[in-house]
C-alpha cells in the first residue's frame, strides 16, 4: 500500500486539530490550535471564519511535518466539525460577509418565536426531527440575511454561499470547487427534511432563504474533491465528513440499530442508532441522521445535557473545592455515599429530556454532616444521573432496552464516574482503547470511501475495549438513589 495514512481534521468550538492515523488506527501525529471566541452582546457568540480556516489549514500542514510524511503518503482527509455554526461567504472572493454565528448563539430567538406564532413548531419537529430553537442553523441564516447590509440582495442574485463548518472547510480546501455537505450536518440546519433527504421548501419559504445558497448534500463517506494545500503537486482526496457527535458514534462503530455512545465533554451527548427508522421522540429527544453512506441513511435519537464536565469546572473555578478535575475521583472515593446530597447543575437551565430554560441549579439535602467530599461526589453523580435521564427517555422512544453503552470524551478517564454510570443505569459501560473517537470517525469515513479500509468489519477488528464497567449495586439501591435525584430535580423547576 503506497498510501499509508489518513488525516482527520477535527474542527471544534474552541480549537482546530489535525490528527494523522495509520492503517492500524494508531495516532501517528497531531497538531492543535485554539482560536478566538467573540461575545459582541449578551447571549451572542461568534467566530471569525477566516481564523477557523487559518487555524485548521495550518494544523494540517504542521501535522504532516510532525509525522514526517508527504502528501503522496496520505490516502484521504476526513472532516468532523462543530455542528450548526453558520457561515455565509462571497462566491467570487471567498470572504465571509459576516462572522460565523456559533451554535451556542441565542440571537435568533425572536425569529423562532415568530415561527411558533405561525404554527410551524410541529412541522419543524416532524420534518427535521429538531426542536424550534436558535441552536440550529436556519434562523441564524435568516438573521444574517435580514441584518447585514446588502446581503439578502446579493444572496438572491446568486453571489453568496451558505455552509456549516464542514462545507466551509471543503470549499476552502478545494479552492471553491466543491460546495457540499453531508446528511449529518444538513440534518442540523433545521432546513433539511430527514425523511425525503431534501432541503425543505416549506421551511425555506417560511425563513425566506434562497435555495441557491445551500450546498449539495453528498454521502458522509465519498470523495468530494481534492486539495493542493500542502503544495504544488499534492492532490489529497477529501473523502468523508460528519458532525462531531455523529462522527463519534461512527468512530465507536455504533453502526447497528440499538447501539449507543455517550460523549462526556463540557456537556454530555448521548446518541443511539435507530437504524433505518426515524423515531419521533415523545420524551424531549432530537431525531437526527446518524450517518448517510452506501446509499442508505441511518437515523439516531440524540439527547444533550448542558452541564457535564462543566460541573467539575465549577467545583474547581468558582468554589475552589479542587485544584484539578482529576482530583474528583480521589475525593469522591473517600466517602461511602453523598450523605443524601444531590447537586442539580441547572446553571443555564436543563437540557433533554426536560428542556426547561428557567430551571436553576441547586444543592439539595444538605445537613450539618455534609462535607466537601460529599459535594464533590454529588457533582460526579449528577453527570451520571443526567445521562440516566437521557437513557430512560431513549428506551421509551425506541422501545429498545440498552444493555451496553460506549463512552468517550475527557471525563471517561474517571473510574468512579464510569462505575457509577454503570450502577445507576444498570448497563455495561465500555471505555475504548482509543478515546479520540470523533476524529477516528472522520478518518473511518474517509478511509472507507477510498478503499484504505475495506469494510466496517475490518474496522471492528481494530477496535479495542480498554475497560468495561458492570453494575455493582442492587436494584433496590439503584431505584432509591434515582428517586432521590428525580425529587431533587423537581425542586429546581
From Swiss-Prot:
Binding site for ADP: 13, 17, 266, 309, 410, 414
Organism domain of life: Bacteria
UniProt activity-regulation remark: Inhibited by fructose 1,6-bisphosphate (FBP).
Positions contributing to glycerol binding: 83-84, 135, 244-245
EC id: 2.7.1.30
Reaction it catalyzes: glycerol + ATP = sn-glycerol 3-phosphate + ADP + H(+)
Residues where ATP binds: 13-15, 266, 309, 313, 410
Record field: transmembrane: none
Membrane recorded as keyword: no
Keyword Transmembrane attributed: no
Positions contributing to sn-glycerol 3-phosphate binding: 13, 83-84, 135, 244
EC primary class: transferase
Family matches, as PROSITE patterns: FGGY_KINASES_1, FGGY_KINASES_2
Annotated GO MF terms: ATP binding; glycerol kinase activity
GO cellular component, as recorded: cytosol
GO biological process, any: glycerol catabolic process
Keywords: ATP-binding, Glycerol metabolism, Kinase, Nucleotide-binding, Transferase
PANTHER family reported for this sequence: GLYCEROL KINASE, SUGAR KINASE
Similarity-based family: Belongs to the FGGY kinase family.
Biological role: Key enzyme in the regulation of glycerol uptake and metabolism. Catalyzes the phosphorylation of glycerol to yield sn-glycerol 3-phosphate.
Name of the protein this chain belongs to: Glycerol kinase
Protein encoded by which gene: glpK
Amino acid at each position: 500500500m503506497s498510501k499509508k495514512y489518513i488525516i482527520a481534521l477535527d474542527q471544534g468550538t474552541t480549537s482546530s486539530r489535525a490528527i494523522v492515523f495509520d492503517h492500524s488506527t494508531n495516532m501517528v501525529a497531531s497538531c492543535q490550535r485554539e482560536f478566538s471566541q467573540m461575545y459582541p452582546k449578551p447571549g451572542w457568540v461568534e467566530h471569525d471564519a477566516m481564523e477557523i480556516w487559518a487555524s485548521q489549514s495550518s494544523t494540517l500542514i504542521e501535522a504532516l511535518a510532525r509525522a514526517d510524511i508527504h502528501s503522496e503518503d496520505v490516502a484521504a482527509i476526513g472532516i468532523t466539525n462543530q455542528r450548526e455554526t453558520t457561515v455565509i461567504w462571497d462566491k467570487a472572493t471567498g470572504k465571509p460577509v459576516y462572522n460565523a454565528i456559533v451554535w451556542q448563539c441565542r440571537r435568533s430567538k425572536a425569529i423562532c418565536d415568530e415561527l411558533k406564532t405561525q404554527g410551524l413548531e410541529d412541522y419543524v419537529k416532524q420534518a427535521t426531527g429538531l426542536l424550534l430553537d436558535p441552536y440550529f442553523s436556519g434562523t441564524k441564516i435568516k438573521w444574517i440575511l435580514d441584518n447585514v447590509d446588502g446581503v439578502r440582495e446579493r444572496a438572491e442574485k446568486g453571489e453568496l454561499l451558505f455552509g456549516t463548518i464542514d462545507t466551509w472547510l471543503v470549499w476552502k480546501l478545494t479552492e471553491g470547487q466543491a460546495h457540499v455537505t453531508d446528511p449529518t450536518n444538513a440534518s442540523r440546519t433545521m432546513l433539511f427534511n430527514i425523511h425525503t433527504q431534501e432541503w425543505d421548501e416549506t421551511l425555506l419559504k417560511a425563513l425566506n432563504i434562497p435555495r441557491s445558497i445551500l450546498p449539495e448534500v453528498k454521502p458522509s463517506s465519498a470523495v468530494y474533491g481534492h486539495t493542493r494545500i500542502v503544495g504544488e503537486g499534492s492532490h489529497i482526496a477529501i473523502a468523508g465528513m460528519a458532525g462531531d457527535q455523529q462522527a463519534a458514534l461512527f468512530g465507536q462503530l455504533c453502526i447497528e440499530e440499538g447501539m449507543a455512545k455517550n460523549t462526556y465533554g463540557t456537556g454530555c451527548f448521548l446518541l443511539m442508532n435507530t437504524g433505518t427508522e426515524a423515531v419521533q421522540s415523545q420524551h424531549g429527544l432530537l431525531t437526527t441522521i446518524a450517518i448517510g453512506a452506501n446509499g442508505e441513511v441511518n437515523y439516531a435519537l440524540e439527547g444533550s445535557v448542558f452541564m457535564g464536565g462543566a460541573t467539575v469546572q465549577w467545583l474547581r473555578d468558582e468554589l475552589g473545592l479542587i485544584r484539578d478535575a482529576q482530583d474528583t475521583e480521589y475525593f469522591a472515593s473517600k466517602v461511602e455515599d453523598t450523605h443524601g446530597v444531590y447537586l442539580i447543575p441547572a446553571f443555564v437551565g436543563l437540557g433533554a429530556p426536560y428542556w426547561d430554560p428557567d430551571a436553576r441549579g441547586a444543592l439539595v439535602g444538605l445537613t450539618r454532616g455534609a462535607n466537601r467530599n460529599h459535594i464533590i461526589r454529588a457533582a460526579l453523580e449528577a453527570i451520571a444521573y443526567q445521562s440516566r435521564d437521557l437513557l430512560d427517555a431513549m428506551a421509551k422512544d425506541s422501545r429498545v432496552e440498552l444493555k451496553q453503552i460506549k463512552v468517550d470524551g475527557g471525563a471517561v478517564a474517571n473510574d468512579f464516574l464510569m462505575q457509577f454510570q454503570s450502577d445507576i443505569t444498570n448497563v455495561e459501560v465500555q471505555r475504548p482503547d482509543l478515546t479520540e473517537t470523533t476524529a477516528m470517525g472522520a478518518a473511518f469515513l474517509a478511509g472507507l470511501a477510498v478503499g484504505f479500509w475495506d469494510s466496517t468489519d475490518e474496522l471492528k477488528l481494530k477496535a479495542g475495549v480498554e475497560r468495561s464497567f458492570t453494575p455493582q449495586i442492587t436494584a433496590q439501591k439503584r431505584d432509591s438513589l434515582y428517586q432521590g435525584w428525580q425529587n431533587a430535580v423537581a425542586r429546581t423547576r
